[in-house]
A protein has these predicted regions:
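Extended terminal
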Residues: 1-17, 37, 41-43, 187-269
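Hydrophobic membrane-insertion alpha-helices, especially the h-region
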Residues: 9-32
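Alpha-helical transmembrane signal-anchor/signal-peptide segments
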Residues: 33-52
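N-terminal beta-strand/beta-hairpin edge segment
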Residues: 48-146
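Short, hydrophobic/aromatic-rich segments at coil-to-beta transitions
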Residues: 58-61, 89-96, 172-176, 204-212
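Amphipathic hydrophobic-ligand
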Residues: 72-83, 102-110, 137-160, 189-197, ...
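Extended amphipathic, helix-rich lipid-handling scaffolds
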Residues: 114-162, 200-211, 240-269
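Short helix-loop boundary/capping segments
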Residues: 161-207
């Protein structure tokens, strides 16, 4: 009699478990795109927003907006819409991004979760990642909204992998940002120059990555080096005016950093 009585109870438990599992699967399968927007807002501390989102977490689109953070009035939205698609490759999640205005080709990002670790990999983009208007940076607030830059920012990578294991960071590969034909409302010069910022992993299990700043061309000469380790950036550099451009760049040099004679000291961290 106990065995017969136990069977209905077991069946009820299995049915309940099945109903709960089905409900959870249904919620996950049809999770609205707004949920992804909330996650992006939290992860970026309110600097990057997915607005006017439609579709689902797995396949959707939204407008990409940059802000100075919570309470900031500096807001700028890129033209067009950012589309995304989520797929799986073994235990990894692959995110494919498309944006006609700015991405040169579909961008693929691979996320590998694990116990006490995770890895984020930016897959190689032979033709470059994309190009964005430099005035978009003004939405980040100070000092960008003061500099009011114009020009183009191009990103490229041969492949980049960021990994965190039990709180320790490691970066392999490289990411290059080219700031082409920069101009600023703070200066009377039509062009400040073109610059390159490179982030390069140290490899061999190192917990820091090298950061470098160099000038490709132009009257404003920028140079510097630093290290990035997870959430912390340490950078030291300098800004100078090329011969003949000193008077036109004085105000800008004063804004960029502490003056030391003809140069301005750049310091972060």
């Amino acid at each position: 009699m106990r065995t017969v009585a136990a069977r209905p109870a077991r069946v009820r438990r299995l049915a309940l478990w099945g109903a709960v599992s089905g409900a959870l699967f249904g919620v996950a399968a049809f999770a609205p795109a707004a949920w992804l927007g909330a996650a992006v807002r939290a992860a970026s501390a309110g600097h990057l927003l997915l607005t006017d989102a439609s579709g689902s977490v797995w396949r959707g689109q939204a407008r990409l907006t940059l802000t100075g953070g919570a309470g900031s009035r500096d807001v700028l939205t890129l033209p067009g819409r950012l589309g995304w698609r989520v797929s799986f490759s073994g235990a990894a999640v692959v995110l494919t991004l498309e944006q006609p205005c700015c991405l040169a080709q579909p961008l693929r990002v691979r996320l590998e979760p694990g116990f006490g670790r995770w890895a984020l990999e930016l897959l190689p983009a032979p033709g470059g990642i994309g190009q964005w208007p430099a005035d978009w940076l003004a939405a980040l607030g100070t000092p960008w909204n003061t500099l009011q830059l114009s020009g183009a920012v191009r990103l490229a990578t041969p492949g980049l992998r960021l990994e965190q294991v039990q709180g320790r960071w490691r970066l392999d590969g490289a990411l290059t940002a080219d700031f082409d034909q920069m101009a600023s409302r703070v200066s009377t010069l039509p062009r400040l120059g073109s610059y390159r910022v490179t982030l390069r992993g140290s490899g061999a299990g190192a917990e820091t990555a090298a950061v470098s700043l160099s000038t490709s061309a132009g009257p404003l000469l920028l140079a510097g080096d630093g290290q990035w380790g997870g959430a912390r950036l340490r950078f030291r550099g300098e800004a100078r005016a090329a011969e003949g451009s000193e008077a036109a760049l004085q105000n800008l040099l004063n804004l960029l950093g502490r003056r030391d004679g003809a140069r301005a000291i750049l310091s972060i961290g």
